[in-house]
């Protein structure tokens, strides 16, 4: 019970007087005397008595009850789980009986939680991810109770052996672990990497065998699943060894066995990726009956600069938000096996070996030249096989400002397509970036050039009162918006580009709704105006993006952002921080193709090609990942999220962090 606050008794007063006398000359006593100035004699006596008695401590029962968790705007209502009174037999340490999957006392959910498969009516499928994956999250996925008692677990082998030894021998009906004076039972393990065969020998010489993994073909399932899991998260043999060591588990397969597993996984992933790209090509035929389509082509390298040994060329369809991967090409200008044998063998012996090595198609080198020439070579290869592979012709090439790849396919001999020209389209995002780069170069070019403004001589057009980084980024963004907001309308697009220059020059006639003077509150019309000498210096730069020939290539309003997003996913599965061979890079490309086009749930087909049953928990995981991908895309597509990204870009410019530096390897981990 709580103590009641009130006046002290006579006995308490006597003890308080002696204790209060000690407080008169202490530091704490001086503080009490200062507080006593605002109290009466009686109130101060009560305050001192409470101090001596000690204020009772509040408990959880004294406070108001906490409200229950009912979810938020992201999770929705949370359903309370039913508490099962009956305990599972596995909780009883003295019990030696087995668990029956049909026993109702075992608390096994009959279907996935609602968060895994959201209500299709509450999900926005207007995003790119939503349109691709809307079939992956339609309704709840129901599993049988027997299916939930499958899969793999982290099990302490000592506890497993102790439990098995309590079971009765089928021959002598005695526990397997019961020992006599002259005979004993023992356990022997035959381990094959992550799979084990446990042999229990009873004192009656009867043997009982327990396998920790079933076989898929000639290999154990766990030994095939483990490399597949490591590859999907961007780890290699060394990372697998470190993971198993920390888990106090046996080491992974030997490197040669690891390579054999990788070859089988590569073969299965290649088949699924080819089927996915074929389906994407058929969708383009369904959307457009013509065989001439518009594609977006771009290249990426395993290492920055021009010293990379591995390069990738990706080609995606341009179909609104539903852009998918149609074809890829992985190039390498080296072969690890050739490099090793060249140092070990003589010249004549190496030539003989290399001839056999090439005839067996084991050499991984498929490109001769620099890393910079990989993109044009890969682009031409992809274009030449378009008709035979997909029955399509890529007649509209959407690329960046680098014209090497486009020139390669346009001027190829013999021509890629007979009597058909390939038209160049500009990426609106790269046009926007070039605008910012030209303005930055102009500021550097005129850094020491004197100008006269308001009777004063100033140097350069940048700095305070001039063209700063924040102003360049805003002009760059307005230029991109002028192109994207007037798709298909060349005069309006050109007028919108020049309206940016006029706005900064103090002319508001052609401004859009983004201008402060057009707003309801009537903002300052000269808020973003620049000095006349600055506007005259940068006026020639606006002639480039406002040119009719360039704007005609931007009427489509498309960008290469889908290619960049696809490249980012590739290097998540094969990080740039770790060097690897071309086969490992190609495996990452194929796996990313499957996920990018059809979602994580399509990876179940890879398990089928490997003759592995994916299982209930793999299906649950992949469905949850697809659901999270759609939710994340919806969250990032809101106006608030877009505004926050714009503000972060401006902050990076103010702090001097160039946006180009964020494309370093591992920068997005």
Where are these regions (language model features)?
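Structured nucleic-acid-interacting core domains from mobile-element enzymes and related host factors
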Residues: 162, 167-183, 214-215, 259-342
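Electropositive, glycine- and tryptophan-enriched low-complexity nucleic-acid-binding patches
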Residues: 208-215, 238, 242, 312-394, ...
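Basic, low-complexity segments
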Residues: 137-219
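Short, positively charged, Gly/Tyr-enriched micro-motifs
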Residues: 43-45, 49-59, 86-121, 194-307, ...
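Short interface patches used for recognition in eukaryotic signaling and trafficking proteins
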Residues: 153-156, 185-186, 222-229, 243-248, ...
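Acidic/histidine-rich catalytic cores and adjacent linkers
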Residues: 100, 107, 116, 124, ...
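A short acidic (Asp/Glu
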Residues: 305-308, 405-412, 435-439
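Polybasic, low-complexity terminal segments and linkers that are predominantly intrinsically disordered
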Residues: 1-145, 624-669
């Amino acid at each position: 019970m709580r103590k009641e606050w009130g006046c002290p008794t006579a006995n308490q007063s006597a003890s308080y007087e002696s204790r209060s006398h000690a407080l008169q000359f202490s530091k704490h006593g001086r503080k009490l005397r200062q507080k006593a100035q605002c109290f009466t004699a009686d109130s101060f006596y009560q305050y001192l008595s409470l101090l001596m008695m000690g204020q009772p401590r509040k408990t959880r029962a004294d406070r108001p009850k906490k409200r229950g968790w009912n979810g938020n705007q992201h999770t929705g209502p949370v359903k309370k789980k039913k508490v099962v009174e009956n305990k599972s037999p596995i909780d009883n340490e003295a019990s030696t009986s087995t668990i029956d999957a049909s026993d109702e006392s075992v608390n096994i959910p009959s279907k996935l939680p609602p968060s895994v498969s959201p209500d299709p009516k509450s999900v926005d499928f207007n995003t790119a991810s939503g349109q691709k994956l809307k079939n992956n999250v339609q309704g709840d996925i129901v599993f049988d109770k027997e299916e939930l008692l499958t899969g793999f677990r982290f099990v302490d082998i000592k506890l497993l052996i102790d439990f098995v030894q309590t079971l009765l021998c089928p021959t002598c009906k005695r526990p397997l672990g019961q020992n006599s004076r002259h005979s004993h039972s023992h356990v022997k393990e035959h381990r094959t990497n992550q799979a084990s065969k446990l042999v229990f020998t009873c004192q009656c010489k009867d043997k009982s065998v327990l396998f920790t993994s079933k076989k898929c073909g000639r290999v154990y399932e766990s030994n095939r699943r483990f490399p597949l899991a490591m590859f999907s998260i961007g780890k290699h043999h060394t990372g697998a060894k470190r993971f198993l060591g920390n888990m106090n588990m046996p080491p992974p397969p030997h490197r040669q066995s690891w390579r054999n597993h990788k070859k089988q996984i590569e073969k299965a992933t290649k088949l699924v990726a080819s089927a996915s790209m074929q389906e994407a090509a058929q969708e383009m035929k369904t959307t457009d009956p013509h065989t001439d389509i518009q594609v977006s082509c771009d290249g990426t390298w395993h290492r920055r600069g021009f010293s990379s040994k591995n390069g990738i060329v990706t080609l995606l369809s341009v179909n609104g938000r539903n852009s998918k991967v149609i074809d890829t090409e992985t190039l390498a200008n080296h072969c690890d096996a050739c490099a090793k044998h060249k140092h070990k063998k003589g010249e004549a012996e190496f030539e003989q070996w290399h001839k056999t090595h090439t005839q067996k198609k084991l050499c991984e080198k498929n490109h001769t030249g620099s890393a910079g020439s990989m993109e044009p070579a890969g682009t031409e290869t992809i274009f030449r096989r378009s008709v035979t592979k997909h029955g399509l012709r890529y007649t509209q090439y959407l690329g960046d400002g680098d014209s090497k790849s486009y020139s390669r396919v346009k001027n190829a001999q013999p021509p890629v397509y007979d009597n058909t020209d390939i038209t160049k389209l500009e990426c609106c995002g790269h046009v926007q970036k070039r605008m910012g780069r030209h303005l930055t170069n102009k500021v550097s070019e005129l850094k020491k050039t004197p100008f006269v403004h308001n009777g004063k001589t100033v140097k350069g057009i940048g700095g305070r009162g001039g063209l700063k980084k924040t102003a360049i980024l805003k002009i760059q963004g307005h230029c991109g918006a002028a192109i994207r907001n007037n798709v298909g309308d060349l005069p309006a697009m050109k007028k919108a580009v020049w309206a940016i220059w006029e706005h900064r020059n103090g002319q508001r006639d052609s401004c859009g709704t983004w201008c402060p003077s057009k707003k309801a509150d009537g903002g300052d019309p000269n808020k973003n105006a620049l000095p006349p000498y600055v506007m005259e210096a940068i006026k020639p730069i606006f002639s480039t993006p406002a040119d009719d020939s360039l704007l005609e290539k931007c009427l489509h309003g498309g960008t290469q952002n889908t290619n960049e997003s696809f490249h980012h996913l590739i290097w998540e599965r094969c990080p740039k921080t770790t060097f690897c061979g071309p086969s490992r890079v190609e495996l990452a490309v194929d796996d990313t193709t499957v996920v990018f086009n059809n979602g994580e749930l399509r990876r179940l087909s890879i398990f089928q090609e490997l003759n592995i049953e994916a299982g209930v928990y793999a299906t649950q995981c992949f469905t949850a990942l697809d659901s999270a991908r759609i939710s994340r895309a919806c969250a990032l597509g809101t106006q608030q999220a877009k505004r926050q990204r714009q503000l972060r870009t401006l902050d990076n410019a103010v702090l001097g962090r160039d946006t180009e530096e964020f494309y370093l390897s591992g920068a997005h981990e």
